């Protein structure tokens, strides 16, 4: 999962 901006989940 990732946000459409910057941060991404550690998935």
Curated annotation (Swiss-Prot):
Q: Which domain of life is it from?
A: Eukaryota
Its chief place of residence is secreted
Keywords from UniProt, A to Z, are: Amidation, Disulfide bond, Ion channel impairing toxin, Secreted, Toxin
Tissues expressing this chain: Expressed by the venom duct.
Post-translation changes: Contains 2 disulfide bonds that can be either 'C1-C3, C2-C4' or 'C1-C4, C2-C3', since these disulfide connectivities have been observed for conotoxins with cysteine framework V (for examples, see AC P0DQQ7 and AC P81755).
Does the keyword section mention Disulfide bond?
yes
The membrane spanning regions, by residue number, are none
As stated in the Swiss-Prot or TrEMBL entry, residues carrying the post-translational modification Asparagine amide are 11
Q: Where does this polypeptide localize?
A: Secreted
What is the protein's known function? Probable toxin that inhibits ion channels.
Its domain comment says: The cysteine framework is V (CC-CC).
Which named protein is this? Answer: Conotoxin Ama1309
Q: What is the lineage of its organism?
A: Eukaryota, Metazoa, Spiralia, Lophotrochozoa, Mollusca
């Amino acid at each position: 999962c990732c946000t459409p901006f910057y941060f991404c989940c550690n998935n």
